[in-house]
């Protein structure tokens, strides 16, 4: 049976400042940790990325032409405050005013994120969000943006608090490149959630007319063997690291006994302790019912089995299928069932996981209000032929995920929109330019845009709300 989505559903496209803008040192923009980290550790940089800094009118015109009525944009913190605080960079402020005006001119609603992996270098080098001073700097930055940009109707504080901590302190593929430090992972999650809560409370106290929420990456975790208690426990602990800890902070205003017991077990196996303060929970409690929406980024699920050995994580950054490895002491090991497809980067394709995660939020956190799927898409080594890409695999991937959204809505979940990652091809943090996600192919040499087959398909779905 053909499935449909509501008439008022937003069909969006997602971007991020550092992955799209380029112009990393232009017009007074301050440095971010990624600038030097990429030069030192990778075979690419974020210059010029998709040159969105100069070509956003082209991308927004394409968005309008192809039925995309919402766009995720992030503000580069160091474009506004080059060192994270203090002196304002007027040219950076002007750029975002112009960008938001172009969005509205093209009838593409901007959903604006304050922090998308790009803390200014001056703050990152003094501990990033492990340093509580930077909570204050973030709240001040948020306050400035809320006041300066009244044309923004939808704000999100952070993009993917979970993967920031994981990338920086567990996998070690994000600056500062620390591996296997679970205490730092949880402390980063916690301090960022406190920053989120304080920004949300400030926004509501000031009486701004828009909406505010947070974007969490929520990969669903399953036990490899549902009958094996050790596998079930491995999935529970993995879920706490990536999902439950931050969801509890967002919607409970504290960590449940089960969550805290899991954290204690993880730290007992891996070492370290957390600094959780009374004033932190006061802030979390004050904001738990103030979130207007939850953004869910969903790409994949994971299956976990029990594991007794030492921690080892190997990141598949070059699309060599089967080269990744993920096992954590005291938690478990990721093992993909044979029947589940995966991408060249070992990302498991499992649309049911999105449905299960949405229904989990609905059940466990009934104060969630509404959900947007703020990222979902297929990374692919696109083949450019006849001035396009025949990306049937991407179409199939998105179609399957839209279908489970239709199911979730039918089953009572309040899902209001979907943002494909990504609007156009952008630079990928730990994969460079080979891994493409866009509806529009970008020739990174010429910066020309070309609609892929998926862009034409997405336009039809957006216009009809029929998933076909």
Curated annotation (Swiss-Prot):
Its EC number is 3.2.1.85. Pfam families: Glyco_hydro_1. Pathway: Carbohydrate metabolism; lactose degradation; D-galactose 6-phosphate and beta-D-glucose from lactose 6-phosphate: step 1/1. One of its GO terms (biological process) is lactose catabolic process via tagatose-6-phosphate. GO terms for molecular function: 6-phospho-beta-galactosidase activity; beta-glucosidase activity. D-galactose 6-phosphate binds at residues 19, 116, 159-160, 297, 428-429, 435, 437. It catalyses: a 6-phospho-beta-D-galactoside + H2O = D-galactose 6-phosphate + an alcohol. InterPro entries: 6P-beta-galactosidase, Glyco_hydro_1, Glyco_hydro_1_AS, Glyco_hydro_1_N_CS, Glycoside_hydrolase_SF. Keywords: Glycosidase, Hydrolase. The active site is at 160 (proton donor), 375 (nucleophile). One of its GO terms (cellular component) is cytosol. It is an enzyme of class 3 (hydrolase). Belongs to the glycosyl hydrolase 1 family. NCBIfam families: lacG, PRK13511.1. PANTHER family: GLYCOSYL HYDROLASE, LP05116P. This is 6-phospho-beta-galactosidase. It comes from Streptococcus pneumoniae (strain ATCC 700669 / Spain 23F-1).
